């Protein structure tokens, strides 16, 4: 059975400022760096063998800290990027107009084709996240990979493994540097394929960020 660990990046400047990041970027805060060091300590205990990260700066920095603790190289995979939030990227969430807020909500309230102008849909996000996860099945036997990605992206992945549609209303909170785990199993008695073992574990963190943006 393959175990794959999923880690969201540490808190960023724009998380703290309540700005929409998407595939735009901002650096980790001092708190985010500390969170990354704490999740790195846990990752070392887990015996991680491979680290695969989104190629955005905030995930790369988080992955670098984890890799240093685990003694692993980092493979960058753009399929693990955050949802493309189109024209709303860099905007403060409290400054959105009613029309813009409706665009944002359509992504996650059951609207299959909802998307922000110049952005991508949750279905498109789900397809590339599942493709990245499936690549882990090609790793050598005995591997224990860790993927570093983003709040909406990981929430979409975990939710769809549980059988929810990609565009379902978001009811899964994955805080900065939380750890989730999904397992791939083949069984005559249990569900075959990917199953969720853990979601959003923050027991390794001193003070989880109260981040409502989840990205």
From Swiss-Prot:
UniProt keywords, alphabetically: Glycolysis, Isomerase
Catalyzed reactions: (2R)-2-phosphoglycerate = (2R)-3-phosphoglycerate
GO biological process, one term: glycolytic process
Transmembrane segment boundaries: none
Name of the top EC class for this enzyme: isomerase
Record-level Gene Ontology MF annotations: phosphatase activity; phosphoglycerate mutase activity
InterPro entries: His_Pase_superF_clade-1, His_PPase_superfam, PG/BPGM_mutase_AS, PGM_Phosphatase, Phosphoglycerate_mutase_GpmB
A cellular component term, taken from the record's GO annotations: cytoplasm
Transition state stabilizer (site feature) positions: 150
Matching NCBIfam families: PRK03482.1
Name recorded for this polypeptide: Probable phosphoglycerate mutase GpmB
Organism phylogeny: Bacteria, Pseudomonadati, Pseudomonadota, Gammaproteobacteria, Enterobacterales
């Amino acid at each position: 059975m393959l175990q794959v660990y999923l880690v969201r990046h540490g808190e960023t400047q724009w998380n703290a400022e309540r700005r929409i990041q998407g595939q735009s970027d901002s650096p980790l805060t001092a708190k985010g760096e500390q969170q990354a060091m704490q999740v790195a300590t846990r990752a070392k205990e887990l015996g991680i063998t491979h680290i695969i990260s989104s190629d955005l700066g905030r995930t790369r920095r988080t992955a670098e800290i984890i890799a240093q603790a685990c003694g692993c190289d980092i493979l960058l995979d753009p399929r693990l990027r955050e949802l493309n939030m189109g024209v709303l990227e860099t905007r403060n969430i409290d400054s959105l107009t009613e029309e813009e807020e409706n665009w944002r909500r359509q992504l996650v309230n059951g609207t299959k084709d909802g998307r922000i102008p110049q952005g991508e849909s949750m279905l498109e996000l789900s397809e590339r996240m599942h493709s990245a996860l499936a690549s882990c099945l090609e790793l050598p036997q005995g591997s224990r990979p860790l993927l570093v990605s983003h709040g909406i992206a990981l929430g979409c992945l975990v939710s769809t493994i549980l059988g929810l549609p990609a565009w379902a209303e978001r009811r899964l909170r994955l805080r900065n540097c939380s750890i989730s785990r999904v397992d791939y199993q083949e069984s005559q008695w249990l569900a075959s394929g990917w199953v969720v073992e853990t979601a959003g574990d923050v027991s390794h963190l001193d003070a989880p960020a109260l981040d409502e943006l989840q990205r």
